């Protein structure tokens, strides 16, 4: 029974991946004449051709192979093997990368192919252990599957052959039944058998079985390859997962290690601190025990010495001591020994009778024991006595420690509070107050004492004093002189001075090639400007332009102090004016050379010779008049004579040998300072020596700062400024005074210290009262009687503020004086308006304006805001306002004088006076006063005027008349009557 004929247990065929098996019958003939019909499995042969090859070639090759006669039976295995190898090569080119051997002795070709596949698989495996294990496993599985299929096919073939041998069925029917399936193959086999006389070997069946096995083997190899690739992919994924897990584990382990290290460190610190604490406690405890033992030993030694002096020396003392040791219960004299329990012998086994003993007397000192000298037992010292001894030693040690006092060096300034001095001495403040009270000075801890009193205290407490002065903080630049080898030539600083409208700024414009006059309000200079120009020869000259108005005398003085050469501009058509003379005085006070520039020579009325002669009145002698002062005739408008002027400036600078050290910390002078709304405080600095750089820390006046930016006269940013170079500096903490010195320091702390000291000195000067004198008392009384005119001044620059304040103070007199509540640089703010509203003062704004909020507050509170651009207008209006506050002036003019000759009654009018007019005239309703012995006894007016009995309006000199006075009858003969008129005039200052 074949596999297909076996009975099925189930109703349905089992599911599987096997295809339906097709069978056919083949007649097998043997050499001895017998034949056998064999049922074989029929499979269609599939030939896989290479691309480009046709089906005809394949069919011809197949027919040729089938037509070859089978010569020998022993070569069947070899042929089958070769065919299998060739078909395998064609069918599965991807499964066998290595070429198969030409002949294999084994009957199954799948085994060789599986072995080759298994050999190739490990070569492609990865070096990972899992991948190496997966590849051989897949190869072994493929090999075993191929062997099983081969064995199963061989077994089926054997069973079929046996069935055919026992059946004896005719082969023709089988061949005819399978003719439709076999096609021409059955006929061909049949014809071959008939024509040949010999039985033909079933090569076609072997080829079909071999093809089916090859297909199965190829499929299994493909599945094995897919399994191997899948296993490799899974191994790679597993390796990546394990690697990630290992990284995470490593990171967790590192974090855990760090945490444990931190905890261990904290624990170690705690343990160390605990050990230190325990060590300190043990040390203190050991020290206390050592002191206690020392005290006990000292007390015991003293007690033993006392006992030896009291007790007589006996030869039998050792014997008595032995007896006392044998009987410790006997009474013994009192001994001062350290606290320790008395030694006792070991308890005896037998208890003796104690009825006769007096235990209450044991260990007590009696007269009998003391006289007999019995020292049978040592008396222990009480705890109270030991405690008292310890306290005594402790007090002695404390007194000894107090006697050792640390001597300190105490720095004492000119003024210091008691508490601060106590802190520096490390003493209690109460002790210093007690010491001062003993000296007769009653102060508290917060009061200030002078340096001499502080020195007495420091000396009394045993310390050393170190006297310092507050001025030590100040920077002393006078002693800082640069060595001669470090000096280098620098440009000259030239100041242009002169009267108003004489052409100073026009000359500067001609030298600079700019137009500064057009930017000034009213065409006059009201600020001091600093510029630097370059001569045609390439040498630089620094120019300072000063105002010519009389209010700016302080600016002119500052300009003369920081300059090297002064150019005094005199208009040839106007001559010498007051400010011209003042400029000459400033230049002489500063001891700088003068160059006279006679300007406006282009006008027809110019007379330079008259200018030279007028200068002789002020001891200015030009070279043309035999002197040493240079003079130049120029015209700033026509730009004539400028080259000669520059030449003389450079000649004068060469004679002066101007030098400075550029390689040092910078020092400069504030030429002008202002508060810019966008940039903050800005100062124009003229560097005198050193180099000022961006980032330098400096002190200027009462303020400190750091150079944030520097710009020159053209508005270009500069990184550094050398000697004689004017720059605008940003970065100040406040607006300094014009003329203050700028000094670069090493640190911000030093800058703040110096600035704080200068601010304190300035505040002290403002608040310190002047010593009282008779003159100052009368002056203060006069000031109180005078009317005050309060106001606030805000200007764009510090120099303008000073000029306005000085000019307003000059117009004050004994009747009214200006009281400046506040003066500052910058715009008008809300705080300025609030201060003015509280005092009822107007606010003067010079080149500044208020912000919108300040304007609203001023409108609400009724504060007057006055704005000016020209200082002339400001001074004139303030004068008029001050005069208006005083009111008009009244002037008396005596128009008549008469003498009373007779007094008579006038009825209801009282008393009338008969007069003789001596001077002038007397009119009715004129104001009159009565003088008696040159003392005014009446001041009023004339009620009525009569001549004889008629009322007259006027009586002139030489005539007689009668008058009555309003509200007065105290008149006598001989009194003088004066009549006068009062004229009201507007007050002027």
Curated annotation (Swiss-Prot):
Ranges of Basic and acidic residues composition bias in the record: 149-159, 234-293, 342-361
Function of the protein: One of the essential components for the initiation of protein synthesis. Protects formylmethionyl-tRNA from spontaneous hydrolysis and promotes its binding to the 30S ribosomal subunits. Also involved in the hydrolysis of GTP during the formation of the 70S ribosomal complex.
GO cellular component, one term: cytosol
Keyword terms of this UniProt record: Cytoplasm, GTP-binding, Initiation factor, Nucleotide-binding, Protein biosynthesis
Keyword flag Cytoplasm: yes
Protein name, per record: Translation initiation factor IF-2
Domain of life per record: Bacteria
Family: Belongs to the TRAFAC class translation factor GTPase superfamily. Classic translation factor GTPase family. IF-2 subfamily.
Region G1, residue ranges: 498-505
Low complexity biased stretches: 105-146, 294-303
Stretch list, region Disordered: 43-219, 234-379
Occurrences of domain tr-type G (ranges): 489-659
InterPro entries referenced in this protein's UniProt entry, alphabetically: EF-G-like_DII, IF2_assoc_dom_bac, IF2_II, IF2_N, P-loop_NTPase, Small_GTP-bd, T_Tr_GTP-bd_dom, TF_IF2_bacterial-like
One GO MF term: GTP binding
Gene behind this protein: infB
Compartments reported by the entry: Cytoplasm
Annotated region described as G2, given as residue ranges: 523-527
Primary site of residence: cytoplasm
Positions with a binding annotation for GTP: 498-505, 545-549, 599-602
